[in-house]
């Protein structure tokens, strides 16, 4: 299996590069390796796709963070597979601008002067999950707004009894040719905005747009293992195409609430588990919480604060690979704030055995007063020793 080149090296940017710097670097490489300007270079298409793959990761904050931490393994399966160069321009059209692909003659790739059919716009909704819902998967009711075909004109934009007419500027192609020095650039028609048609008598309800606002409500399935910042795609649930093409998609942006016990790190869960001094010193069998209920864990004698035990398979499933992470139990020894007299006595005996220096026993305030007014006599033998020294 061939080793992949570092994405930062592919785009020729530093690891600290900003999103804007990544965008500029990708545009530069896209122009350099575009197949239409490198017809005699068979490797140009491969380099173009390699740059696109690198850009798709480094331009996305979540994918970039996983790549920085785990390398290519962290984003395996997270990038799109593009059939041809035109698919790339469909995906990153906003970055290049409307006429970028046609600048290199991309229009001929779609059958000469045919008008390009555009997808409908994508929409978004926000979904908040508990950690348990994210781990197991769930069904959620979502509400979002989108534009749909006008129910009065059926999306034509024209009033009843009239029909859209062919655009006189572009001849129905949706695009026009503009000269820029020795270059001829094909761009979206400014008159019909790429639709290829003009509305003579607009619909009174939608005012010629062919769409109307809608509040969409649906129940969606959230797959197990999603993480904060991920997106769930609802294909075809976006807005309609202005050209009769496919609808856009709805993307559900996932937000996962913090848990009061567990902290998530990728597919692993981290739990800080308190145990007593006696349990740490002598060993114990304790019950630790998991998302599936209590789990029995054996703590060997002499366990130190900070030791981590791994409970296999009690983490979060990876929605791409299907592998399940682990529960990492981090031990810390909890020191009691209050001790009974017996507990204090036993601990002092232990300290004496270990030759540990500890604070003396507390003396009550009344004992201190009694000692102040009636101090104890000096120990016998102290005075005679001084006398002997004087002599």
Swiss-Prot record:
Signal peptide: none
Gene Ontology BP term (one): protein refolding
One Gene Ontology molecular-function label: heat shock protein binding
Predominant location category: cytoplasm
CDD domains per UniProt: DnaJ, DnaJ_C
Superkingdom: Bacteria
InterPro entries: DnaJ, DnaJ_C, DnaJ_domain, DnaJ_domain_CS, HSP40/DnaJ_pept-bd, HSP_DnaJ_Cys-rich_dom, HSP_DnaJ_Cys-rich_dom_sf, J_dom_sf
Gene3D superfamilies hit by this protein: DnaJ domain (1.10.287.110), Heat shock protein DnaJ, cysteine-rich domain (2.10.230.10), Urease metallochaperone UreE, N-terminal domain (2.60.260.20)
Location within or outside the cell: Cytoplasm
Keyword Transit peptide appears in the UniProt entry: no
Keyword Iron among UniProt keywords: no
Family: Belongs to the DnaJ family.
Protein name as catalogued: Chaperone protein DnaJ
Native species: Rhodopirellula baltica (strain DSM 10527 / NCIMB 13988 / SH1)
